[in-house]
Amino acid sequence: MYKKQIVLILIALSTTFIFDNVRAASTLDSLEQVLARLPDSARLIKLNDLAYQNPDDYSYKIYAEKLLKEAEQQKNNKYLGNAYFLLIKYHYSHDIDSMRLLLKEAEPVFLNGNNLEYFFRTKTWNIYTYEQQENDERVFSEAKLINKLSEQLNYPEGKEMVDQAIAHYYSSN
């Protein structure tokens, strides 16, 4: 009796999952057609808006990846920085290793675009990941490095972000 119920539940769940994926794919296909007809600058703006509108949805990552490609093609540092920020934010919750790789790629983009908030915010997220991994040594070495960069770049908000991360570290331990 229980086996039949479990099988029926699994079938219902998988059917729902399949239909949701098909619906999402068709929406993205339609969007691809609309985006292809837009001028370059409008395409960047639309992709950026779509990525920021769906922060809790998987399509958020897809839009951010499309924004990254489009911004690279158009050599637009502003939107390139936005795309990196969104992808780092996504991977912060899903895949720390990918987050760190993207962070290395994004740092020069953030600095060249003078987007210090994104630079320091993402560097500080890295401190939180070391805290989650219980890597105390890296928590403090990264904090020290970021504080030094904050001073060099004359961006006191960077130090504030680090102070919050360290306060969180101490309150969690």
Regions found by a protein language model. Name each.
Residues 8-17:
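Bacterial N-terminal signal peptides
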Residues 2-8, 21-173:
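A "functional boundary" signal
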